[in-house]
């Protein structure tokens, strides 16, 4: 079974999986890594790739985005009911004409924002996935109040979900521990037999390229510095570490001095100027091996 991400997600790693594979620690390929830990799991491209290819005794994932982590939890524990909810959203949406589809989208978005705390979890996740597949460019963006505020996307025939893929994801997540919080939440799980992959919100290369508003918590330079300190702390523990970030050589060269810093080419799928969706851009991979 081939498992693919079930959400569109900013900074998704599908485009650089081959470079990530080339740079994985040899201990992983030799079967000496027992634990995989990913504190910025996002859309899960790296997680799904590694879980299909390598054996781990323990897998721990986390992200600060509560709705995202609820998604993983529901897909893992209640996939059949989720598929029912999604089917009903999809069928109603696809039966409407364009103008009514737009109205339906905003109705679901309002429900999603209003019922944050007292909505049934499965229903909420179905709304989350529906919005992700029908909103503009598949973005996830919230305002400071934490309200999802992306406009309608006007796709002709959006594929809201892939039933078989969701079931496969559910199987793959069976033994995965799902956390939610700041990246330091994984600290207690990391030991010398761990491989940790960090994929934080990228430091913007310029003012317009910033896309870190997928939580109401900004990830700024202070957070990048805090993350680098955490990276050094885990390095001393003997864990194998890999981190992705933007091609900002001056900033990261100083921050991760002494580590193995490589330049890789990524193709970006989410970009507001639709015609530039597949530009190749450089990124950094930073490893402690």
Curated annotation (Swiss-Prot):
Protein name: Type II methyltransferase M.MjaIII
Classification via PANTHER family: DNA ADENINE METHYLASE
Swiss-Prot/TrEMBL catalytic activity: a 2'-deoxyadenosine in DNA + S-adenosyl-L-methionine = an N(6)-methyl-2'-deoxyadenosine in DNA + S-adenosyl-L-homocysteine + H(+)
Positions bound to S-adenosyl-L-methionine: 9, 13, 63, 199
Source organism per UniProt: Methanocaldococcus jannaschii (strain ATCC 43067 / DSM 2661 / JAL-1 / JCM 10045 / NBRC 100440) (Methanococcus jannaschii)
NCBIfam families in the record: dam (TIGR00571)
SUPFAM superfamilies the record matches: S-adenosyl-L-methionine-dependent methyltransferases
Lineage: Archaea, Methanobacteriati, Methanobacteriota, Methanomada group, Methanococci
EC number(s) from the headed UniProt entry: 2.1.1.72
Keyword Transferase: yes
Entry keyword set: DNA-binding, Methyltransferase, Restriction system, S-adenosyl-L-methionine, Transferase
Matching Pfam families: MethyltransfD12 (PF02086)
Superkingdom field: Archaea
Similarity-based family: Belongs to the N(4)/N(6)-methyltransferase family.
InterPro entries noted in UniProt: Ade_MeTrfase_dom_2, DNA_methylase_N6_adenine_CS, M_m6A_EcoRV, MeTrfase_D12, SAM-dependent_MTases_sf
GO BP term, example: methylation
């Amino acid at each position: 079974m081939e498992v693919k991400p079930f959400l569109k997600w900013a900074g998704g790693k599908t485009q650089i999986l081959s470079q990530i594979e080339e740079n994985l620690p040899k201990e992983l390929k030799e079967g000496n890594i027992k634990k995989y830990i990913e504190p910025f799991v996002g859309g899960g491209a790296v997680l799904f790739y590694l879980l299909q290819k390598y054996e781990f005794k323990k897998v721990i994932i986390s992200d600060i985005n509560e709705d995202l982590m609820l998604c993983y939890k529901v897909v893992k524990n209640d996939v059949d009911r989720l598929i029912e909810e999604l089917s009903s959203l999809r069928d109603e949406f696809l039966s409407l004409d364009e103008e009514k589809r737009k109205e339906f989208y905003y109705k679901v978005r309002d429900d999603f924002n209003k019922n944050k705390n007292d909505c049934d979890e499965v229903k909420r996740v179905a709304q989350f996935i529906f919005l992700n597949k029908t909103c503009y460019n598949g973005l996830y963006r919230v305002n400071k109040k934490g309200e999802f505020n992306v406009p309608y996307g006007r796709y002709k025939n959006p594929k809201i979900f892939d039933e078989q893929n969701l079931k496969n994801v559910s199987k793959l997540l069976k033994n995965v521990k799902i956390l939610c919080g700041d990246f330091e939440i994984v600290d207690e799980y990391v030991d010398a037999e761990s491989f940790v992959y960090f994929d934080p919100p990228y430091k913007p290369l310029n003012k317009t390229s910033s896309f870190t508003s997928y939580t109401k918590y900004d990830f700024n330079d202070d957070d990048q510095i805090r993350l680098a300190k955490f990276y050094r702390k885990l390095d001393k523990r003997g864990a194998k570490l890999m981190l992705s970030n933007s091609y900002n050589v001056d900033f990261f060269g100083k921050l991760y001095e002494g580590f193995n810093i490589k330049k890789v080419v990524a193709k970006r799928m989410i970009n507001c100027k639709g015609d530039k969706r597949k530009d190749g851009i450089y990124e950094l991979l930073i490893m402690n091996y």
